[in-house]
Amino acid sequence: MNPNQKIITIGSVSLTIATICFLMQIAILVTTVTLHFKQYECSSPPNNQVMPCEPIIIERNITEIVYLTNTTIEKEICPKLVEYRNWSKPQCKITGFAPFSKDNSIRLSAGGDIWVTREPYVSCDPGKCYQFALGQGTTLNNKHSNDTIHDRTPYRTLLMNELGVPFHLGTKQVCIAWSSSSCHDGKAWLHVCVTGHDKNATASFIYDGRLVDSIGSWSKNILRTQESECVCINGTCTVVMTDGSASERADTKILFIEEGKIVHISPLSGSAQHVEECSCYPRYPGVRCVCRDNWKGSNRPIVDINVKDYSIVSSYVCSGLVGDTPRKNDRSSSSYCRNPNNEKGNHGVKGWAFDDGNDVWMGRTIGEELRSGYETFKVIGGWSTPNSKLQINRQVIVDSDNRSGYSGIFSVEGKSCINRCFYVELIRGREQETRVWWTSNSIVVFCGTSGTYGTGSWPDGADINLMPI
């Protein structure tokens, strides 16, 4: 090959390489632009059940890094299909309960702006748990906190924070409410918010941040609801509401709600005589609630809800170790599954229990007359055997020298089973602590565990002498 041929060959090869590089750069540019725009787009299937990929979404799915020569492109994978929750997994097998969360709201109020609250509860969406409470329209270190022992005022609102975050000044006020319930159906939050005059209150149904439906008082006597989470199965949410006397017969209804719209209302049926402040949990294919009888029984009523045909069955927890306060001592107390026990039934406190085969797990105040201390245990045969009293796996959550209050259940879906958790309201201030003029609370939260656990006590812990008056 002569020199001229060599020059021509080298030039041709160089031109070919330059052309290839030029085409590669064009391909890289096109790919970059395409991926840049596609990271904000999702192709929606016919049922339109895909969440849009928009820059405002905080919770991302996965991120892939694609390397092309020296260019790095970040490509976001669109979120998975959003589906209704069906809660069809079995209940987790547990040996007891382990500590999960504590917000220390009252202790923090001694030196910070924390809301005055009561009636707290916990509920979870598919990815995260939140704490709720009914605020009193004031912080604790504020003269408006005087006389906040009252339950129903137009200033009360439903507060919502991530679990473990106290209700600070930046807390979202979800709705106006002096009674409430909240639950997530797998797609969005439903909030049931009751407010208004005692004799003509309104319940608002807020779904996905929008008011969808409402219902007025049907007995003109303090319309009220659960003060803990409702339950949604396959898009149908159930909430138990009562209107009427707190110490005689009242009118309880179970509302069935789909995306915020009331689709059916069933009256309470069965042998339960008085039902308030139910603590409900999914028991596929239905919903099961353990409630407060404020009239005749210190044994707790059970309400079983059929989500498919809207039928209702009610009875009472069989355990002779009863769950309400006030109550008789354990030697004298009784329950025979069907009817109220007529033992110190007038008055009571919100509480919880759940079935475990023929047995029952339950929590209650340690005090038989006062809302002091808190304990949990399992009663063998307590769900099916009348007046069963064999107690095992007892745990002290709050020692008897410290105050407690309401308690309730919430459910958390794991990979293979559904766990049951509970919270305890730790009330401080009036009526018992008269040095101060306010009434508020903090919470402590435990969840079921299949492991081992130790002992302890987790009271509110605030020194009332260090608190604002």
UniProtKB/Swiss-Prot annotation:
Cofactors: Ca(2+)
Glycosylation sites: 61, 70, 86, 146, 200, 234, 402
Membrane topology: Single-pass type II membrane protein
Biological-process GO terms, alphabetical: carbohydrate metabolic process; viral budding from plasma membrane
Enzyme Commission (EC) number: 3.2.1.18
Domain of life: Viruses
Intravirion domain ranges by topology: 1-9
Chain ranges on the Virion surface side, renumbered to this chain: 31-469
GO cellular component, one term: membrane
The keyword Transmembrane is annotated on this UniProt entry: yes
Binding annotation for substrate: 118, 152, 276-277, 292, 371
PTM notes: N-glycosylated.
Oligomeric and partner information: Homotetramer.
Record's miscellaneous remark: The influenza A genome consist of 8 RNA segments. Genetic variation of hemagglutinin and/or neuraminidase genes results in the emergence of new influenza strains. The mechanism of variation can be the result of point mutations or the result of genetic reassortment between segments of two different strains.
Protein name stated in the entry: Neuraminidase
Organism name: Influenza A virus (strain A/Hong Kong/5/1983 H3N2)
